[in-house]
Amino acid sequence: MKVLVIGDPLLSSERLEAAVKKILGDVEVARVDWKPASDEEFWFLRSEVEKKGPSAGKPPVEIFDHVGDIDIIITHHTPINAEIVTAAKKCRIIGACRAGVENVDVAAASKQGIAVFHTMGRNAHAVSDYTIGLMLAEMRNIGRAHAELKQGHWKKQYSNAAFVGDMLEKKIGLVGFGYIGHLVAKKLKGFDVEILVYDPYANAADVEASG
């Protein structure tokens, strides 16, 4: 089995190779790194790919030195466009080490019989942390107070003063109880709140077991 790992400024090919060998054992690994001329160019191209798809990026030409006899391609943010997919005659799997597959030409891969996988839940902890952070910021008017202080004002009353305060014993409703919803509920337990869940696809026993 031959695996091509394609790194970028956020996740190097060395780290991808180490992960592949940890999971698959002693397989043959080829490494390529996407190295735009500057950080600014990388973030610009990444944004273009997010909005317009893999054809908007500029993947490294070194990919074509290896892709012809590769079984698996592992990428992070590097665009895998139709040209790369077409050249990957033996490839059967493309794995994206991210939550989405915006940087992979899924239609071209499907046409060629290549399965495309992404990393579900990769950013779930970050999203759940941020969700709780927003709850605290809203209840404690952190953002509003910061803005007032920057203007030299010490404001004591806010429009939501009548119904905010401590998190303690608040009722919190979660719409959706997938992986992120589970994490939010788990992290909220330390605040001693009552959690209400709505998710037509969730198993009632699973919700109860989560507390």
Q: What is the predicted role of each segment?
A:
Residues 1-70:
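N-terminal glycine-/charge-rich "phosphate-binding" loop or analogous flexible N-terminal tail
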Residues 3-6, 31, 73-75, 94, ...:
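Short, hydrophobic beta-strand segments that form beta-sheet elements in well-ordered domains
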Residues 7, 69-150, 164:
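Phosphate/diphosphate ligand-binding glycine-rich loop within oxidoreductases
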Residues 10, 78-79, 199-204:
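Short, polar loop motifs at secondary-structure junctions
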Residues 52-58, 75-76, 151-158, 209-211:
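Short gly/ser/thr-rich secondary-structure transition/capping motifs
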Residues 60-63, 81-84, 160-163, 210-211:
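Acidic, amphipathic alpha-helical patches
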Residues 64-65, 107, 186:
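Alpha-helical segments flanking ligand/cofactor-binding loops in enzyme cores
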Residues 142, 160-211:
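Rossmann-like dinucleotide/phosphate-binding beta-alpha-beta segment
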